Amino acid sequence: MTRKIIAVIPASGVGSRMQAGLPKQYLKLQNKTILEHTLEIFLAHPDIEKIVVAVAETDPFYPQVALLDSPKIQIVFGGETRAHSVFNALQVIEDDSWVLVHDAARPCLKRSDLDKLLQIDDKQGAILATPAIDTMKRADGNKIMRTEDRSTLWHALTPQFFPTRLLKQALISAFKKNLTVTDEASAMEFNGYQPRLIAGRSDNLKITRPEDLALAEFYLTQNTEKKI
């Protein structure tokens, strides 16, 4: 069955941990903004019909991103939190479609990982993730309480892939209960779903701190040279 697949890129955050003079999605790597690198991944995929980008209503930078003029891209205004920004984007997407939600600050996603995720046809949805390889500590402030069993722990990545109608319902339910929604999978979990974990690549990093920029630029250079 052919599915209508829409990508959602929440890009209304300010990125305070980057300590930069502008939101991190507008910082440049290889003469392109991080947002442009991210958008190019989805614009190039033949199975993705449309991309909805959620930006802050007061954002003075997004009009300068020429790629956002693509007829395949629709702009909406974000909300108070990432989850509300995603929800706002879902309002312009048909309920019978599937939605891929991806962080604007993850420009190193590989096409091979995206293709793996798009093969999933399970209404509970799926996310890219990587198994925890470091020793994981439970903390109380800055003191260790205990060591967790890392064999059952995964790092959640994006994209995260769900039926639009179910994700919308899950977010509404979470908002009504004042639950903290840190990613789309958590909203689905709160509503009794068990999204699948699809093992992804660890170089699909989220640019969060200044030191992440050099690593992301290295990965992007590798992608260009190897055409992954």
Curated annotation (Swiss-Prot):
Keywords: Isoprene biosynthesis, Nucleotidyltransferase, Transferase. Pathway: Isoprenoid biosynthesis; isopentenyl diphosphate biosynthesis via DXP pathway; isopentenyl diphosphate from 1-deoxy-D-xylulose 5-phosphate: step 2/6. The record marks 150, 206 as: Positions MEP for the nucleophilic attack. Pfam families: IspD. It comes from the Bacteria. The keyword Cell membrane does not apply. The record marks 17, 24 as: Transition state stabilizer. Gene3D superfamilies: Spore Coat Polysaccharide Biosynthesis Protein SpsA, Chain A. One of its GO terms (biological process) is isopentenyl diphosphate biosynthetic process, methylerythritol 4-phosphate pathway. Signal peptide: none annotated. One of its GO terms (molecular function) is 2-C-methyl-D-erythritol 4-phosphate cytidylyltransferase activity. InterPro entries: IspD, IspD/TarI, IspD/TarI_cytidylyltransf_bact, ISPD_synthase_CS, Nucleotide-diphossugar_trans. Its EC number is 2.7.7.60. It catalyses: 2-C-methyl-D-erythritol 4-phosphate + CTP + H(+) = 4-CDP-2-C-methyl-D-erythritol + diphosphate. Catalyzes the formation of 4-diphosphocytidyl-2-C-methyl-D-erythritol from CTP and 2-C-methyl-D-erythritol 4-phosphate (MEP). Belongs to the IspD/TarI cytidylyltransferase family. IspD subfamily. HAMAP family: IspD (MF_00108). This is 2-C-methyl-D-erythritol 4-phosphate cytidylyltransferase. It comes from Actinobacillus pleuropneumoniae serotype 3 (strain JL03).
